[in-house]
Structures are given as C-alpha cells and as structure tokens.
UniProtKB/Swiss-Prot annotation:
<dbReference type="GO" id="GO:0006260">
    <property type="term" value="P:DNA replication"/>
</dbReference>
<dbReference type="Pfam" id="PF08644">
    <property type="entry name" value="SPT16"/>
</dbReference>
<dbReference type="Pfam" id="PF21091">
    <property type="entry name" value="SPT16_C"/>
</dbReference>
<dbReference type="GO" id="GO:0006368">
    <property type="term" value="P:transcription elongation by RNA polymerase II"/>
</dbReference>
<protein>
    <recommendedName>
        <fullName>FACT complex subunit SPT16</fullName>
    </recommendedName>
</protein>
<feature type="compositionally biased region" description="Acidic residues">
    <location>
        <begin position="957"/>
        <end position="991"/>
    </location>
</feature>
<dbReference type="Pfam" id="PF08512">
    <property type="entry name" value="Rttp106-like_middle"/>
</dbReference>
<dbReference type="InterPro" id="IPR000994">
    <property type="entry name" value="Pept_M24"/>
</dbReference>
<feature type="coiled-coil region">
    <location>
        <begin position="99"/>
        <end position="124"/>
    </location>
</feature>
<dbReference type="InterPro" id="IPR029148">
    <property type="entry name" value="FACT-SPT16_Nlobe"/>
</dbReference>
<dbReference type="InterPro" id="IPR029149">
    <property type="entry name" value="Creatin/AminoP/Spt16_N"/>
</dbReference>
<feature type="compositionally biased region" description="Acidic residues">
    <location>
        <begin position="998"/>
        <end position="1017"/>
    </location>
</feature>
<dbReference type="InterPro" id="IPR048969">
    <property type="entry name" value="FACT_SPT16_C"/>
</dbReference>
<comment type="similarity">
    <text>Belongs to the peptidase M24 family. SPT16 subfamily.</text>
</comment>
<keyword id="KW-0158">Chromosome</keyword>
<dbReference type="Pfam" id="PF00557">
    <property type="entry name" value="Peptidase_M24"/>
</dbReference>
<dbReference type="InterPro" id="IPR040258">
    <property type="entry name" value="Spt16"/>
</dbReference>
Length: 1033
C-alpha cells in the first residue's frame, strides 16, 4: 500500500509483527514484554536493533515512535502524522488472536503524551516485571527526553527487571523470505558492479603510476553512487533481480559502509577497517572492499589484487581460495555449530600450511541482512547458542594478515569476502560473483627478466668514459658556454619527456572518465526551468484603487495591473520582458512586451522561462496603451522599469547564493580549557568598525567572536574547511591563518568562501631627532643610537608572533581529528602576477597556489587542476599569462596575468614537478567558447585528441614566433563568464593600464634589417670563438 510516497507491505508487517509477538517469550531470560523506543534518526549508526526492527516490520524507520509487545497484543505510540500510515494495518489484526493498537501523540499537548507513557508503563508492569529491550541501543531526541525520566522512575517504582533481547531478535529475523532474498540478490549484484569499478580504478592507477591516496581512491568510488549516468546503467542490470511485483528503485540503493582500499604495508582485516591517507602502493597486494545495501538489506565483497606478486604470494592466495571454498561447501551446513566451523578451519590450516595459522583472522564471518554484522551470529572461537539454519544469509570473510615475503621482505595480506545465502533446503549459494580467480586478479607490470636484460644491454651500449681533466688544465667545466647549454638542454629534454607522459596520462584519464553515456545527444533539447509565480490567489487581494481603470504598479505583489475591457488584469513582473515609451502628437504611447515561448530573446542561454510550453496555451506578446496624460505615463513606465530592475537584482542574488550550504551548529567545548587566540583581526569582518576579536577552538569547529556584539561572530566547522594555511610574517607586514571553505557561508547577505585571521607584525614609531633624553621618552628605544637593538627587538617580536600563530594553526588541525592539515607557502618559489586587479606575489604550497595578503584572495588546489596554459609567450614581450583549467568542467578557469617572462622556465619546471601538464600559446584563447564545447560533449572532446590541439610546439616557443608588435593583453571574450572574479568595478581599470608592457615599443621602432644578430646567433659565434681559441693567458 502507498500513502504519500510511503509504501508499506501490510501483509509482511502482519506476519512479522505476530511472529515476534508470539516468539519473544522463548527468548533468553523469558521476558514478559518487549519495549523499543526510537528517538531521532541516528545516521552515524544505522544498525541498531530498534532501527532494524522498524525496517523489518515497516520497510522504513519511524522516528519518535515506541513499540511494545505483550502476550496478546502490540502497542505503537507515534505522532498523528505517522499514525495515518499505520492505521490501515489495524484491520489486518481484526480476525487474529493477536491485536494491534496505535496510540497517537499530540506535540502540542504534553499532558496527553505523558498520560500515554504512564498507560504504557502500567501495561508493562501488569504483564510481568521482566521487560526485554535492546540495551545497547542509544538514541537522542525530544521523545527520549520526555520518556526517559518516566521510565527510570517506573523501573524503581514497579521493580522492573530489564534484560537484553538482542540475541532473541537476531534469531527471529535471521531466516529470510523470498522477498528478502530478492533484495539481498539486488544488493549483492550492486556490490559486484562497484567492485568491478574499483578494480578498474585500482589497475589504472597502478598502471599509470598515478599519485593518489587510498582514501582519495575510495572517495572516488563512493561518490559514484550519486552519478546518475552510472546508476542508469546499473538499474538495467539490477531490475530483473527485484521481486516480481516490484521495479528497481535507485532511491533505496545506498552504501552499507564506505568503500575500503588498503595497500602498502598497513592492512586491517577487520570489518571496521578504513582507507588510510597513504599513497596507493602498486606492488604486492591491494585489498578492496565494498558493500551495497538495497532497501536496507546489506551485502559485502572483498577482493585481493596481486601486483607483480612473488610465487609465495600466489601460493598463499591459492590456499585462501581453497580455504574459502571448503568453508562454504563443506562446513556451512544447517545445524552446524559456528564454533565448530571455526575450529575445523584452523585444523585445516594447521594441516596444510601451519606457518599461516598465526596470521589468520579471528573469525570467518557473521550473519547478515538488515544488520551488516550481527554479533549474535559470529562464526568464531567464542561459544554461542546460535546454529546455522536454512534461509540465513552470511558474510563469509577470511584472510591472512601481516604476512612477510621471504624473498623480498615485503609485508602484504590476502583476504576474501562474499555474501552467501542458504536456501530452504540448506544449500549455500554465493550471491557476490565477481571473479576471484588468481589469473584474473594478478597483474604484472614489471618483468624482472626483461628488466635485467635491458640493464645489461644499456651497460654494453654505454660509450667509453672520457678522461677527467687534471688539475693543471686551464679549461674548467664552468668556463665553456657549450657545457652550460648542454646541461640546460638535458634538463629541458627531461622536462619535455615528463610533460609528454603527463599529457598522455591526461588523455587516457579523460577517455576513462567520460564514456558514450556522457555525450550529449545532438537532438536533445536544452532543459528549461520554469518559474512558478502568481500575483493574487483571490480576487479580493487586488488593490481597491484599480477601480479608476488606470495602469497601476503593485510593488507588494510584484505585479503590473492593466485595464483591459474595463477589467483590471494583473501581469506578474516575471512575465514582463521590456517596454518603450513614445510621444506622438498629444498622445503618449506605452508599449509593454511580455515573455512567451518562441519569442525573440528566449535563446539557448536562457536558463529559466516564465512559462511552460504547451500548444493549448495562448500568450500575450505585447500590449500598447495610449494616454493624453504624458506625465502619468512617464511615471508608470519608470515604476515598471524600477520594479523590473529590483526583480532582476533579487533573482541574481538568489542565484549567487544558490551554492550556499546551511552549516550544522557549532558544538561548544564545555569540558577543559578552550584554546583561544586574542587580538585577532578578521577579513572579511562582520563589523563595520575595525576592532580585534578572539578565535576559539571548539569540538567541531572554530569561532571568531567580535567584542562589539555577542551575535557578531563567525562559526566555521571543521567538516567545511577545505584548506588551512599558515603564512608567517617573513617579507610581509602581517601574520596569517587562512581558511578556505568547501562550501561558501553567509556573512550578513554576502557569500564568502575565504576567511582570514591576522595580526599586524610590527608597530612602527620613529624618533627622527635621536637627541631626546632616553629615560624621558615614551618610545625610548626608537632613537638612532638604538637602531640595531630596535631591529633585533623587531625580529624577536616577529618570531614570537609566527610561533604563536603556527601553534594555534596546528591546534586547529589537531582538534579536527585528522580532517585538516596545516599548509604553508614556499616564499622562495613565489612569483609576481595579476590574478585580479593588481599585481601580487603568488606562492606555491604543498597542495595549492595561493595569494593571501591582498583581497580578493587566490587559492588554487593543484589536485583539482586539469591543465595549465601559458598564454602570450612571445619574443619581445616582458610578461605572459597563466590559465588554470579544472577537472570540474563546470568551474570557471582561473587567470593569473602579467607574470614576468623571467619566471617562465621556473614555472614550467614547477608545473612539471607537481604533475600538472602545461601547454604554451602565443595568444590569448577564447576560454568561454572552449569550455562550452568541452562541457557540451567531453567524450567527443577527448576522442578528438583532447588538449592536444594546444600542445603543438607547446614547449618550443622559440619556433615560428612573430616579432611584430602585438597587444600585450586582450580580453578573451566580451562576456567575462569564464573569469573567477568579476565585478563592475573592473570597468574603472583599462586594459592598457593593467597589462601594459613598458618596453614593448622598443621592439616596434625600426625594421628587421636595422636590427643586429639575435641571441642565438651571438651564442653560436661566442661558442665558435671559444673552440678556436688556445686559452692562453
């Protein structure tokens, strides 16, 4: 049955509710009743028994709900809104000997709710003093706060004995019906598909030697569940596995846990393992695990991928395959004791490979279903009353950890996990079918024999060593121009080779990232988003002054009211397009144009239309009104124009704030001493006055508190911080802690993504005379005679200030529990550039390129950069431009203009060192056009060669260069939509002023015939002169 989007199988609800109601008396401890209290949803722990009970009975979790089971009936206490979904179930129990009662709470009547709780407690005490509850469950919420005091008092008053019923619940729902088996098949097939995706990503990363961490790789897989194109393909595979009366619903597909990737020498074979931040290590073994759940039914799969394995590794993996097969086929039998299964497994290992016994996992699996890991159904050495039974589902997981290869000394691990379902006759079948054959999971990238042969060959082909010059020689290595040039050319060749590999990798990644499904259908029409609005709901809302049959502008309702045939007709301002006013003779004509489908001005760039196209709809495109009252018509036209401007401005503000995410609340630190940093200025500031405030570190974030008002503060959560920077006062007048956010936050009505805390590094005061008596002066150390001491004091102050800020930045990172890491710029690697309106000093950090001194700030995360283009690189120009294109194609490109040409070689080297491919262009490119074509069809873009259209001669800018005078800078497009920062203020600055080249005219005067030899010719002549010289002194 479906009600408001919630579909409940009431037959399954009846069967399961009565099953538990009649079976609980046989639970351990013989409870007289069962009680389940669920408060707010706990997304951090979705596997609590009460939550699972709700999912088992209803298919959903009903927050703020109590469920109680008695000998002859069950009682559900919930809100009236939820009760309407459950009331149809009551009729199912009318002919049964087990009844259902639903008691409705009233959020506005506390006394009524209290009476319901007291009646329930009375029923519990009347049925007996032993109450079964899942004692490990923990929930929060308003209902818990209301219930808990009454319950604690009732336990004392009625001498209630509370026992744990968790094991009994597990035994009740461990057997799966046909519908539950279908859900498990769907989730297992989903796990197979995601494992296939994981294996492709892992092998590609190892093959391409990508620098990616285990956690980043797992995050990439985890985010794929939100990829609509991938889910569309997945749906067609999973739909046939659904129950016959259901269709696959992607909204019920979710992760049972975050995917896990483990490599290197650190392996954790427990279900609680997590991907670490170490780089993916492409040698030995890589463990990959993922689990999908569908309609809350879980599945699990783990595979080991062997990279260039030794014989010992493959032998141990083959033994693991045999061991898993033995457990599933021979030991997992109905009525078998889980402890016996584990002991027989250990005996088999001791018999075949005793050296692996100490490395074996502490269990080989557990019950699985709505609960990912049911502790009551563990298969380990611990004795349990649980027995293997038909229709159960198990996660069979086993492996050997902390193994050390005897040949190479490398630490590795092997592990396998599969979802196994027992049928009604007790026969096990493996639901996760992704391959685990050694031939399919072993990959060889480095052949040792080939490497040795190549090494011998290279040694044989080496030229004989040249005799070293002795100490009496007049020819020194650094004296010859040719030798210096040879070194530079060698470095350049290395850089070119590295760039070639980076471009090849970029092309391969592009083809892998985008498939045919990403290509936009040429016949597909662009999607329009239709604005929904209405001026008035009822006719009585129309202003009374419209009776004069004149044009009126209702600012409150954003409406133009026009008199048509003696009736006031409202037109919402969103329907108004533009208008004009003309005077002809004694009449003033007012023409109003309205939006309509197919009308001019509604082009491809229009993202929103005021109407939905429908052939049955009729539209007014324009109206012309005339009047002899010219002043009145002018005033009306002005009001309409102003109203349209206000509406447009409001819509632009709404779009600008569309990506603002509402943050969770900051949890203040109420235990221990709160770390703080005083006398801090903030940019941007919530106050109009410039006053220093205080920064506090709390449990889940930091807070800046202004001294002017208690509500004047900025809260920043650790989870929303993307980058945390510390910049010392070296070479600057301020010391900085800078926070770059993942999602912008609001400060007043302004959207901000960068927040900076700083303090001035020096307070300058100068005594120009130096003749005053020192003891009588306020600033007694500021005389000329103490200038050296003053400088030393200045250095000490700066060092102390840097130390204080650095410690506080590290304290922020430490309080984030590993979410953040402090990054600092390398000043020696910095260069001048113009990312916005003025020249600033840009500096690389470990992960970013930043400029934090002068707003607007610049933060470019290097791992998000797809490619860098160096523009206007020509002979005769003193500077060039940099353009960063991001992997997220929807993100505008970032420009850094007017970089000194002397920095070109250094920047090329730096880009190569951080694995960013670059190309060189002699002109400014039209990035709005390039990015639009790339966004429209990225798959075809990479099929056509990707960024190779820019790479021709990209690192040989001296070839085919023109020496004619060109403009140093031209905007790439009139529409600055590809710029990262743009405002109307930029119009005050002319391009000539911002990007002028003072020396460019030097190359324009005179013809080419008048010029002397270029630098290349002069270098050749000098080298020839060196060779002809006898180097005599």
């Amino acid at each position: 049955m479906s009600d408001g989007g919630i579909e409940i199988d009431f037959q399954a609800f009846y069967d399961r509710f009565t099953k538990l109601g009649k079976a609980y008396s046989g639970f351990e401890g013989s409870p007289n009743s069962l009680l389940f209290v669920l408060g707010s949803t706990n997304e951090e722990n979705p596997y609590q028994k009460t939550t699972i009970l709700h999912n088992w009975l209803l298919g959903y979790e009903f927050p703020a709900t109590l469920i109680a089971f008695f000998k002859d009936k069950g009682v559900i206490i919930t809100s009236s809104a939820k009760a309407k979904h459950l009331l149809p179930a009551v009729t199912k129990f009318e002919g049964s000997d087990y009844k259902l009662e639903i008691w409705q709470r009233n959020n506005k009547d506390a006394n009524h709710n209290k009476k319901l709780f007291e009646d329930l407690i009375k029923l519990l005490s009347e049925n007996g003093n032993t109450v079964g509850v899942p004692t490990k469950d923990s929930y929060q919420g308003k209902l818990i706060l209301e219930w808990k005091p009454l319950w604690e008092e009732a336990k004392k008053t009625h001498s209630l004995n509370v026992i744990d019923c968790s094991a009994g619940l597990s035994s009740t729902w461990k057997g799966k019906d046909d519908k539950e088996k279908a859900y498990l098949s769907v989730s297992s097939k989903g796990s197979d598909k995601f494992m296939d995706l994981m294996s492709n990503e892992i092998v590609n990363a190892v093959d391409e030697e990508l620098k990616i961490s285990n956690s980043k790789l797992s995050d990439k897989i985890e985010n794929k569940i939100d990829d609509s194109k991938f889910l569309k393909k997945l749906s067609s595979d999973l739909n046939p596995l659904c129950p016959t009366d259901e269709k696959f619903d992607v909204n019920f597909l979710d992760w049972a846990y975050s995917p896990i990737v483990q490599s290197g020498s650190k392996f954790d074979l427990k279900v609680s393992a997590r991907s670490n931040n170490d780089s993916l290590f492409g040698k030995g073994s890589i463990l990959a695990s993922c689990g999908i759940r569908y309609k809350n039914y879980c599945s699990n799969i783990t595979r080991t991928f062997l990279i260039d394995p030794t014989d010992e590794m493959t032998d141990n993996y083959d033994f693991l395959l045999i061991l898993q097969e033995k457990i599933i086929d021979d030991l997992l039998k109905v009525e078998a004791d889980p402890t016996s299964i584990y002991e027989k497994t250990l005996e088999f290992i001791k018999e075949k490979k005793p050296e692996l016994l100490s490395h074996f996992t502490k269990n080989v699996g557990s019950l699985m279903g709505l609960e990912f890991r049911d502790s009551a159904g563990m298969i380990n050495a611990k004795p349990t009353a649980h027995k293997i039974s038909e229709n159960c589902c198990y996660n069979i997981s086993l492996g050997f950890g902390n193994l050390k290869d005897s040949k190479t000394g490398q630490v590795y691990a092997v592990q396998l996990a599969d979802t196994v379902q027992l049928s009604s006759d007790g026969k096990p079948s493996t639901l996760t079918k992704y391959t685990k054959a050694r031939s399919q999971i072993s990959f060889y990238f480095n052949n040792e024999e080939e490497n040795k042969a190549a090494t011998v060959k290279s040694e044989k082909s080496k030229p004989p060593a040249l005799p070293k010059p002795d100490g009496t020689s007049k020819i020194l290595r650094s004296k010859l121009r040719g030798e210096s040039r040879a070194d530079d050319e060698e470095k350049e060749q290395i850089r070119k080779e590295n760039q070639r590999k980076l471009h090849e990798r970029l092309q391969k990644e592009g083809l892998l990232r985008y498939s045919d499904a990403d290509a936009v259908d040429g016949d597909e029409k662009p999607k329009h988003f239709f604005k929904k609005y209405e001026s008035y709901v009822r006719e009585t809302q129309i202003p009374s002054n419209v009776r004069d049959l004149k044009i009126h502008v209702d600012w409150k309702s954003q409406t133009i009211i026009l008199p048509i045939y003696g009736r006031p007709v409202p037109f919402h301002i969103n329907s108004y397009k533009n208008g004009s006013k003309n005077e002809e003779g004694e009449y003033t004509y007012l023409r109003l144009n309205f939006h309509s489908p197919g009308a001019g001005g509604v082009g491809k760039k229009t993202e929103e239309l005021p109407y939905e196209e429908n052939p049955e709809n009729q539209f007014v495109r324009s109206l012309t009104l005339r009047s002899k009252d010219g002043a009145r018509m002018s005033d009306v036209f002005k009001q309409i124009t102003d109203l349209k401007k206000e509406s447009t401005k409001r819509e632009q503000e709404r779009k600008a704030l569309a990506d603002v995410v509402v943050q969770a609340k900051l949890v203040e630190n109420k235990t221990g001493r709160t770390k703080r940093l005083d006398q801090i200025f903030v940019r941007p500031s919530p106050d109009t006055k410039r006053v220093p405030g205080t920064v506090f570190i709390h449990e889940n974030g930091i807070r800046y508190q202004s001294p002017l008002r208690t509500d004047s503060r900025i809260d920043i959560l650790f989870s929303n911080i993307k980058n945390l920077f510390f910049q010392s006062s070296k070479g600057e007048l301020i010391v900085i802690i800078h926070v770059h956010l993942k999602n912008p936050i609001l400060m007043g009505k302004k959207k901000i993504q960068d927040i900076q805390f700083y303090r001035e590094a020096s307070d300058m005061a100068v005594d120009e005379t130096g003749n005053s008596r020192r003891n009588n002066m306020k600033f007694r150390r500021y005389g000329d005679e103490d200038e050296l001491e003053q400088e030393q004091e200045e250095r000490r102050k700066r060092a102390a200030l840097d130390k204080e800020f650095r410690y506080f930045a590290e304290a922020i990172a430490e309080a984030s529990d590993g979410l953040l890491d402090v990054d600092s710029p390398f000043r020696d690697l910095g260069f001048q550039g113009v990312p916005s309106r003025s020249a600033v000093f840009c500096m690389p950090t470990r992960d970013c390129l930043i400029q934090l001194v002068e707003p607007p700030f610049l933060v470019i995360n290097l791992n998000e950069v797809e490619i860098c283009i160096l523009e206007r690189v020509q002979f005769g120009l003193k500077n060039f431009d940099m353009v960063f294109v991001y992997k997220d194609l929807t993100k505008p490109v970032s420009h850094i203009n007017t970089v000194p040409i002397e920095q070109l070689e250094f920047i090329k080297t730096w880009l190569t060192d951080v694995d960013i491919p670059y190309t060189v262009s002699t002109i400014n490119l039209n990035w709005s056009t390039i990015m639009k074509s790339l966004q429209d069809d990225p798959h075809q873009f990479f099929l056509d060669g990707g960024w190779s259209f820019l790479a021709t001669g990209s690192d040989d800018e001296r070839s085919d260069e023109s020496e004619e005078e060109i403009s140093e800078y031209e905007a790439s497009d009139e529409d600055p939509s590809d710029e990262e920062v743009y405002s109307e203020e930029e119009e005050d600055y002319s391009d000539d002023e911002k990007f002028s080249d003072e020396g460019s005219d030097d190359f324009a005067d005179g013809s080419e015939d008048d010029e002397g030899d270029d630098w290349d010719d002069l270098e050749k002549k000098a080298a020839k002169a060196d060779r002809n010289s006898n180097y005599k002194e």
